[in-house]
Regions:
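Aromatic-rich, lipid-facing transmembrane alpha helices and their immediate juxtamembrane interface loops
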Residues: 1-302
């Protein structure tokens, strides 16, 4: 088992390194018209990173999470392109390789990656992962707490789209039927992004709450890696593309809404690394909550 985990860690590091180098080099515009056949192959590196990290993070529950994320993204895209639901109006993709003739497979896989990155970053920020912090945080019940975590997941995904969507609309990757106020993108689109990510992670978090699993994880670089991937995918890739396209305003707004979460996650990671009680942590929030409740009882009896 230790060798298997070590091998997965190596795959995570390799995929993240390739992703970062390829994005920085500007060779991975996966949807843009000027992409090359070589660049297309790198478009799936982020997905591979997510799969490897999920296997390390969630183990046997990784397929459940990834399946929920894929289903949520696919359903929303099919409803959006066909009926204009979820995102406020109809839109269509200009790529030729579409699933059901409506949505490129790369878009569906990107949904999986974005939702997982949002989920993982929230877990890094989550004070419940620092068992002592739960003492004052979790007082309203675990279900409400999960609701708050999923809300943060939704914002993380939505903020990424605030730089992603304008770039692809400008490049002709997809077209909104009636345009929109935000660089040609309707505001309702971002509300849709929020709720799709929220729904996917909420389902999994509630499932985990009802069927707890005890999976401890060290707070090491692998634990922090989703933050690096999120920053690389969003800020580096789309920030550079925005600049190349002559629309730095996309990057300014996108980075402005993404960076605070990246900074908070980085700070949280550093704090947890320096706290002996938080290494390793349990990914089972119910176990964390029970431990904190026991700690509170002990404190009250002192």
């Amino acid at each position: 088992m230790a060798k298997a985990i070590s091998a997965v860690n190596v795959l995570i590091i390799v995929s993240l390194t390739v992703l970062a180098l390829s994005e920085i080099a500007g060779i991975v515009p996966t949807y843009l018209p000027h992409q090359t056949a070589f660049a297309k192959q790198f478009g799936y590196i982020l997905v591979l990173f997510v799969v490897f990290h999920a296997l390390r993070n969630l183990k046997f529950r990784a397929p459940i999470f990834l399946g929920i994320a894929f289903a949520a993204g696919a359903l929303s895209e099919l409803l959006g392109t066909t009926y204009g639901w979820i995102y406020g109006q109809r839109y269509y993709y200009t790529a030729s390789d579409k699933v059901f003739g409506l949505v490129p497979l790369s878009v569906l896989l990107t949904w999986v990656a974005v939702i997982y990155l949002a989920y993982s970053i929230t877990n890094i920020i989550d004070p419940a992962k620092n068992l002592l912090a739960l003492k004052k945080v979790v007082r309203v019940g675990s279900f409400i707490y999960v609701l708050l975590l999923s809300t943060l997941d939704g914002f993380l995904a939505m903020n990424l789209d605030m730089i992603l969507d304008p770039v692809y609309v400008r490049s002709g990757g997809w077209v909104w039927q009636d345009g929109g106020a935000y660089f040609g993108v309707p505001i309702s689109n971002f509300i849709g992004w929020f709720f799709v990510a929220f729904a996917a992670t909420f389902i999994f978090r509630v499932y985990s709450l009802r069927k707890p699993f005890d999976t401890a994880q060290k707070i090491d670089f692998i634990f922090f890696a989703p933050v690096v991937a999120y920053a690389t995918f969003g800020i580096v890739k789309y920030g550079v593309l925005s600049y190349v396209m002559g629309h730095t305003e996309y990057a300014v707004i996108g980075i402005s809404v993404m960076f605070p979460f990246i900074a908070i996650a980085t700070l949280s990671y550093q704090l947890k690394r320096s706290t002996p009680e938080s290494t390793p942590i349990s990914l089972d929030i119910t176990k964390d909550i029970n431990l904190t409740q026991k700690q509170r009882v002990l404190d009250e009896n002192r």
